[in-house]
Curated annotation (Swiss-Prot):
GO terms for biological process: chemotaxis. It is found in: Cytoplasm. PROSITE patterns: CHEB, RESPONSE_REGULATORY. It comes from the Archaea. PANTHER family: PROTEIN-GLUTAMATE METHYLESTERASE/PROTEIN-GLUTAMINE GLUTAMINASE, PROTEIN-GLUTAMATE METHYLESTERASE_PROTEIN-GLUTAMINE GLUTAMINASE. The gene is cheB. GO terms for molecular function: phosphorelay response regulator activity; protein-glutamate methylesterase activity; protein-glutamine glutaminase activity. It comes from Archaeoglobus fulgidus (strain ATCC 49558 / DSM 4304 / JCM 9628 / NBRC 100126 / VC-16). SMART domains: REC (SM00448). Involved in chemotaxis. Part of a chemotaxis signal transduction system that modulates chemotaxis in response to various stimuli. Catalyzes the demethylation of specific methylglutamate residues introduced into the chemoreceptors (methyl-accepting chemotaxis proteins or MCP) by CheR. Also mediates the irreversible deamidation of specific glutamine residues to glutamic acid. Residues 159-345 form the CheB-type methylesterase domain. GO terms for cellular component: cytoplasm. The modification 4-aspartylphosphate is found at residue 52. This is Protein-glutamate methylesterase/protein-glutamine glutaminase.
Length: 349
């Protein structure tokens, strides 16, 4: 595997090169700004690029756009943990970056705390589907809002969506197509660090008909609202006296992640029984497989994103293999399937 390392800091370039080389990954070259990055990407055709966002001459976002147009390559962004960093990182994911690693704060460049994560994400990026990068670039996806035939609402139903690597772009193909009158709350669990999920919710809210917000502890759940699990916490729901409230809880990671789709799924099934529509999108690992099976076994309906429209097919594949999936659909048809499945649930006697 051949990697191009791009950062305006010589210390960061050295640190990243050192981490990757020790893991047996070849660093073919480094670049100190976006302009160099584009030139070297075209010339060297690396398997993966690590890319800083804030650089002189040409920033990372501009470079990323050009690379995606001229030489689509899996890119892992190195970003800061600031609010601005979170916003720029989401923009990078939208443009086509595969994933990101947050650089620890501080003047000293110590990347040892993220070394394992960096290696894992670079290795995963190398195996991602470039067809999916191209699919995102085409942006053919933004269809109309899907209208449902709800008539009178007969029962409490909810929607749960789980995603990881490639998830923000996938969610942009689904959430903006859900109608404002959707007769259910939508719970979204996207694997992300603290701070990033708030930015994700704000971004989705600005392009959607439904309200999208980061979930808050103890808030009462309402239909037509999309609740995004806060990064670094698990999101549960509890029903008491026929009122459903959100519980944002700390605790150990589950499936090595926090928030975990499985944790939310478990509580959703306790609160809603089989009146759940679940969807599992692109992502690495197996989080959500158990949760989708749980929903399906209780009589809920579940959807997995098809392999050819997943950046990483890990989570949907695990859910399918476990027998937890009712229907497999391309990501740009999942909004329709969610609405159709809600109609089925509402019409069940």
């Amino acid at each position: 595997m051949r990697v191009l390392v791009v950062d305006d800091s010589a210390l960061v370039r050295m640190a990243v090169t050192d981490i990757l080389t020790k893991a047996g990954i070849e660093v073919v070259d480094t670049a100190k700004n976006g302009r160099e990055a584009v030139e070297k990407a075209l010339k060297l055709k690396p398997d993966v690029i690590t890319l800083d966002i804030n650089m002189p001459e040409m920033d990372g976002l501009t470079a990323l756009k050009l690379i995606m147009e001229k030489q689509p390559t899996p890119v892992v962004m190195l970003s800061s943990l600031t609010k601005e960093g979170a916003r720029e990182t989401l923009e990078a994911l939208k443009i086509g970056a595969v994933d990101f690693v947050t650089k620890p704060d501080g003047a000293l460049v110590d990347l040892s705390s993220v070394a394992q994560e960096l290696v894992r994400k670079v290795q995963m990026a190398a195996s991602t589907s470039l067809n999916v990068l191209r699919l995102q670039n085409l942006k053919k996806i933004k269809g109309e809002v899907v209208r449902g035939n709800w008539k009178g609402k007969t029962k409490d139903v909810c929607v749960l969506i789980g995603s990881s690597t490639g998830g923000p772009s996938a969610l942009e193909m689904i959430i903006p197509r859900l109608p404002a009158d959707i007769p259910a709350p939508v719970f979204v669990v996207q694997h992300m660090p603290p701070g990033f999920t708030k930015q994700l919710a704000e971004r989705l809210n600005s392009i959607s008909e439904v309200e999208v917000k980061e979930a808050e502890n103890n808030e009462r759940v309402k239909d037509g609202v999309v609740y995004v699990a806060p990064g670094g916490y698990h999101m549960k729901v509890r029903r008491a006296a026929n009122v459903v409230r959100i519980k944002v809880v700390d605790g150990e990671p589950v499936n090595a992640v926090k928030p975990s789709v499985d944790v939310t799924a478990d509580s959703v099934v306790q609160a809603y029984g089989g009146n759940v529509v679940g969807a599992i999108l692109t992502g690495m690992g197996e989080d959500g497989a158990y949760g989708m099976k749980l929903i399906k076994d209780r009589g809920g309906l579940t959807i997995a994103s098809s392999e050819d429209t997943c950046m990483v097919f890990g989570m949907p594949k695990a859910a399918i293999e476990l027998g937890g999936i009712t229907s497999v659909k391309p990501v740009f048809e999942i909004a329709e399937e969610i609405v159709r499945f809600l109609e089925v649930k509402l019409n069940e006697r």
